[in-house]
């Protein structure tokens, strides 16, 4: 399988991440991508670079105000009186209340950053745009005839909304890939198997019928992102019925996961898309630091084989999966499983 990768991410190394009121080192570190890259190289996958697709693919998903903010925020932040090294918000709009766009950079940070897990450093914009190019190129390779392509994206993207960074994510790579596939295919499906709900992806396509979004994730009553990912969220307007959430109990193992995945695959078959984008989170693993589920390393092969049996042109986009000795083996298992049924 072709693997699209760039080392531009290496200088994006967020230092701050708030956990239960304490600032800690972010779990979204460059070492994640290095371990994933080592795994695909060890298994003999062909690693290719992505060209610069320009601003078009990201602009097709994200607002101009948000993109300007992401590109300029860090340099502008450093001009403030006594700034931190990274941009972090300390105030947010209140949902359901009137909200005007602020001129103040501090206000813009609160407007465009949904939490304290998406700090912006000097190299964040370059890493995020490079990551989006990887997803776009993977989609283009699939349009050019590849059965499946893996985009080794870092930073991840599925928590990013049209105008808001969130949960380690800045540009929504799976949404960008899906929109690129829409240039050819009237219908595209997104299947998110990250342990966390793909809230940004849901928000982007919530009122659209041309992209089916399905997410399997830890029950948001007890697990981040908490406020979205419930089964009753089914889309709105033209998109009603085209957003499916399958929240799973924390600690779910392969036996509990497979029925939900098979239901998701049945929904994809019924939708009959021309192509599929998989938000490939590996953080449902039993020893992932987030400890949300109990999928084993061989279990990822089983899950991905089930997805491959859909028989669709498929873009695999890296999402979560955090530092442990199992991270690389989990990816290797997932890709082998997909190849076994492709």
Where are each of the predicted segments found?
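HDAC/HDAC-like amidohydrolase catalytic core signature
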Residues: 1-191, 196-342
């Amino acid at each position: 399988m072709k693997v699209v990768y760039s080392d531009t991410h290496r200088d994006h190394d967020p230092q701050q991440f708030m956990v239960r009121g304490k600032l800690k080192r972010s779990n979204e570190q460059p070492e994640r991508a290095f371990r994933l890259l080592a795994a695909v190289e060890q298994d003999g996958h062909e690693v290719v670079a992505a060209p610069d697709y320009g601003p078009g693919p990201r602009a097709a998903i994200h607002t101009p105000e948000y993109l300007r903010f992401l590109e300029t925020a860090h340099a502008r932040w450093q001009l403030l009186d006594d700034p931190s090294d990274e941009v972090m918000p300390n105030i947010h709009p209140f949902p359901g209340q009137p909200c005007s766009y602020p001129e103040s950079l501090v206000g813009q940070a609160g407007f465009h950053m949904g939490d304290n897990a998406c700090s912006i450093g000097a190299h964040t914009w370059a890493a995020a745009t490079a990551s989006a190019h990887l997803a776009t190129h993977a989609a283009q390779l699939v349009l050019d005839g590849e059965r499946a392509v893996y985009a080794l994206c870092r930073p991840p993207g599925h928590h990013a909304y049209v105008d808001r960074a969130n949960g380690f994510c800045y540009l929504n790579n799976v949404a960008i890939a899906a929109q690129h596939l829409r240039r050819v295919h009237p219908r595209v499906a997104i299947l998110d198997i990250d342990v966390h709900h793909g809230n940004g992806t849901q928000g982007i396509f919530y009122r659209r019928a041309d992209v089916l979004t399905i997410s399997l994730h830890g029950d948001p009553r007890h697990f981040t992102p908490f406020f979205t990912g419930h089964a009753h969220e089914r889309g709105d307007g033209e998109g009603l019925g085209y957003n499916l959430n399958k929240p799973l109990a924390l600690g779910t193992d392969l036996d509990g996961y497979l029925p939900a995945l098979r239901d998701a695959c049945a929904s994809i078959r019924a939708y009959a898309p021309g192509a599929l984008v998989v938000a490939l989170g590996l953080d449902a693993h039993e020893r992932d630091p987030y400890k949300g589920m109990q999928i084993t390393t061989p279990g990822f092969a089983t899950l991905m084989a089930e997805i491959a049996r859909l028989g669709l042109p498929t873009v695999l986009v890296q999402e979560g999966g955090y530092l442990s000795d199992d991270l690389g083996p989990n990816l290797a298992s997932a890709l082998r499983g997909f190849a076994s049924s492709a």
